[in-house]
Amino acid sequence: MKNSFLENLNQGVHGLKPYEPGLPLEHTQKKLGLDKMIKLASNENPLGPSPKALDLLQGKMNTFSSEFNRYPDGNAYELKEAISKKYNVNLNQITIGNGSNDLIEFVSRCFLGEGKKAIYSQHGFAIYPLAIKATGALPVKSKAKNWGHDLELMSDLIDDKTKVIFIASPNNPTGTAKTLSEIKDFLKNLPDDILVFLDQAYYEYIEGSEFDIPFSLIDDYPNLVISRSFSKAHGLAALRLGFCISNPELSDYLNRVRQPFNANSLALDLGKVALFDQEHISKSVKINSSGMHKVKKAFSNLNYNFIESWGNFISFDAKQDSDLAFQYFLEKGVILRSLKVYEMPQHLRVSIGTEEEMDFFLRVLEDYEKDLSKK
């Protein structure tokens, strides 16, 4: 029997392919029957959550459990106060998301629809075209330059139907980043009726002051939205929490399409503590920098081309079909990310893990290179 009601699906939903997350660690290890397996596929913080956030969780466990029947603070007031204090922004500039993906959805729902366009970059985050298409709008893919955003080309692609431009710095999965000067030049020459969503989920890992893009830039460019995430350096990926800063009028509209209780109580309470745990953030960045240096050195020694990264991951040319390479590492106990879906048919992405995890990955990489050279 034909489900005729499916004929009424919104046009943009037809043909959508769902986002595919990294393989789950325990299930995959059990399925393959391996004694040891590590996951370096989802750009998670190998140190885990902020210790101060965990201390709060332990101390308030009884309180939390007795309040599970209560809705969370729908306005996230205390978390917004913490963000306001740390970044010197006004409360009415802040929008809280269930992860930063939520914020991408807010912007798409507010500004996109049938007959409209949004521009994103080749090799850019897979959620951008999904969010655009779901509204019925047309995603316009701008060809990448040196694995990153070609801002000049993105400007050239603008027409009277363009409403939003998505930019990530650092960009996932390539790790490329844009300097403040490059972003300023781009905004300066952009029509002020086009919204720019600057995704900075990996902001804390950036090394180099030239890449520091302050929230105060919004004062000069009210069509700019800057998003951040608690999933990476803060180690709260499981709680799904992010935020964006925009001009107050825009923030008002973003909050109108936001679900009333989109961030749960645990996320709100732990987020405001993790935000100020600078010791944990610094340690996370230090471990990432050390692991990045080690893996880049190994890639160079084994003659693997890699893309310079400003995130907590690095992508490299596996010298063969990325799905085949992914399967090899998987069977050896390392979950990586194949980048074929990102139009990078020979590239794998590896998240920077603990020293022990990176040593394990590099041993498998050496075995991979030996086996590859036999073919």
Task: Identify what each model region corresponds to.
Residues 2-99, 106:
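N-terminal small-domain helix-loop-helix segment of the aminotransferase-like
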Residues 110-167:
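PLP-dependent aminotransferase-like
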Residues 50, 223-307:
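PLP-dependent aminotransferase class I/II
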Residues 133, 151-160, 173-196, 200-233:
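Active-site pre-lysine segment of PLP-dependent enzymes
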Residues 36, 90-94, 115-117, 161, ...:
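Short acidic capping loops at alpha-helix termini that bridge into adjacent secondary structure
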Residues 181, 328-332, 336-337, 341-375:
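PLP-dependent enzyme catalytic core of the Aspartate aminotransferase-like
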Residues 289, 299-332:
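Conserved PLP-binding catalytic core of the aspartate aminotransferase-like
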